[in-house]
Each structure stands twice: as structure tokens, then as C-alpha cells.
Amino acid sequence: MAEQKDLDFTYTTIDEIFRLSMGESGDYSGAKYDGNFSMSLEEAQKAKHKFIADSLNITKGSKVLDMACGWAPFIRYIIHERNAESIGLTLSQGQADACQKNGYNVMVKDCRYVKPEDFGTFDAITCIGGLEHFCSVEEWQAGKQKEVYRDFFKTVHDLLPVGGRFYMQTMTFSKNMIEFEELDVNAKKGSAAYVMALMVKEFPGSWLPYGPEMVIKCAEPGFKLISQSSGRLDYIETIAQWRKKFRKFNLKKYWLYLSLIPRYFTDMEFRHLVAIFKVSPNKVCFEKEVMDHYRLVFEKV
Ligand SMILES: C[S@@+](CC[C@H](N)C(=O)[O-])C[C@H]1O[C@@H](n2cnc3c(N)ncnc32)[C@H](O)[C@@H]1O
């Protein structure tokens, strides 16, 4: 599993740059264009929020747990558009500080270990782009991946009433995934071996499920699947829009980029993180169908 230090590396490092690029409560997960790429990124993210809130029957007063909440974009939506109540959990201190400053009820807590005694139970639960971080390469190599996901679904199960719904979206490996031994940061630029090696650098402590089937199977028998759709093409467009926003000039942001230069020369891992901004390995992985992306709605039975 990714630990707090890993998630601080991935998210807290870019906290201010992210907020200056995407807004204080920007989404850092695939939007929902449904193939209509004339939509703006903001419209497509809002369409995603609406889809999730509708799928989970979130209305006025619903109590919602947003696991792996990032900078709280979904929390912002359900508070303002549905008058719902929400608690958000993240493992990035920078995200939690920013969310609290913006008035959201967000804390640093590992969502995989939440118990009903902590906050009570919920009407609905979301985990948007969190599962990717729950199983490490080492756990996968030790054959523990399914156990990790089953334990997670057990946690969610205990927090919902029968009939309560859970939404998750997650990247998965897809039909062109290569062998782990082939991953190599020195491989040909643009190759699956190279971009997958960068992915592992960008998301330390993280490994993906092998297709949605693995996730759906691990959710049984406590959950039935209500709906499933691939967001792979939508994610490619999302990343293309993120790249423009990260590059858009803003004096403070460019100053922050400059302030990171010394670290670039002294920290090899950080140098790989910078390469990610140039290459967008996840976009290449989606294009090559090394990876896919799924939106899954579950109901507790
Ligand atoms: C890709 S971001 C998605 C953020 C947000 N859901 C969104 O859509 O913008 C992944 C998030 O997962 C969080 N995360 C990963 N593992 C976690 C864990 N075990 N407990 C709580 N949060 C976790 C990270 O801190 C980060 O906020």
C-alpha cells in the first residue's frame, strides 16, 4: 500500500501548483465527457459529479464519505448542489490543509481502516481514484492483491446500510500490459516499458488491479454491481486538458516551478516526477491500452 510519505510525494509536492492550475478544489481524476470533447474540462468534471451523485441517490441531508478525496471537488459539488453532508479523507497533508482552509471537513486518515465507531455509518460512499494506491508492488508480488481489495470492500460494507451505494473509479491494467520485469526507466522513450516505469515512480507504493473483473469479484458477495463503464478515452482528453492548465502562465506558479530546480539536481526520484509532467505516462498507457479506466457503481446486498 502507498503510505503517507508516498502520497505526500505525489500530491503534496504539487499542492500549490495544482491549485494555481486547476482551482482550489480541482479534480485530479478522469472527467466524464462521454465522448463529447467539445465540452470544457470543467463541464465534464461536473457531469461526472452529477452522474455519481445521481447513481448514489445523494439528496439533501445525505451523509456521504468521500474516501481519497483529493482537493475535495466532489465534496464541493454535493454540498453546493445537493445540500448533502460530507466527510473527506486523504493521506496527503497538503491536500487536507488546503481543503480545511477552503472550509471542507477533510482530514488525514487512511480510509481503508475506517470503522463505524469513527464517524458512524453513511448513506453513500465514494472512492474516486483511490484504489490505485491501495496495493503496492510488493503486496502484488506476494500474491496479496485480492486480499487487499477484499479487505477494503469489507471496510466499505461495514459503513453502509443494506441498499447503500458505493461509487469507485479506478485505473486498471488492460490487454497490452507488459511483464513487470520489462519496466525500465532507460527503455526507449514512449515505449510501454518506459512509461510504465515512470508510472511506478510517479505513484510509489501503488499497483493497479488487472481489469475491472478483479475488482468486481473482490466486491462479492457483499456488493452487487449496478453499472460499469470505461472512461479510458475520456481520461486521455482529461489529461490533455490538464497539461494545458499546468503550463498556462501564472507568475506565482512559474516561481514555484523555478524554486523546484535545486531539488531536480539533487533528488533522482523527484527528477522522475518532473519527467512525468513532460511525458504524461498515464496518457500514453491509456492510448496504448496498457491501462484502462473504469467507473463502477456498487450496492450493498
Ligand atoms: C488521484 S487522487 C484523486 C482525488 C479525488 N478523489 C479527485 O477525484 O480529485 C488520489 C487520492 O487518493 C488519496 N489516497 C490514496 N490512498 C489513500 C488512503 N489509503 N486513505 C486515504 N486517502 C488515500 C490521496 O491522498 C489522493 O487524495
Regions found by a protein language model. Name each.
Residues 145-162:
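A short glycine-rich, Lys/Arg-flanked "PGG" loop and its adjoining helix->strand segment in the class I
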Residues 103-113:
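Conserved SAM-binding strand-loop segment of SAM-dependent methyltransferases
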Residues 163-170:
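Conserved beta-strand signature within the Rossmann-like core of class I S-adenosyl-L-methionine
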Residues 172-290, 301:
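Substrate-binding/catalytic lobe of Class I Rossmann-like enzymes that use SAM or dcSAM, i.e.
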Residues 1-55:
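Conserved Class I S-adenosyl-L-methionine-dependent methyltransferase catalytic core
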Residues 114-125:
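A short acidic, Gly/Pro-enriched loop at the edge of an enzyme's catalytic core
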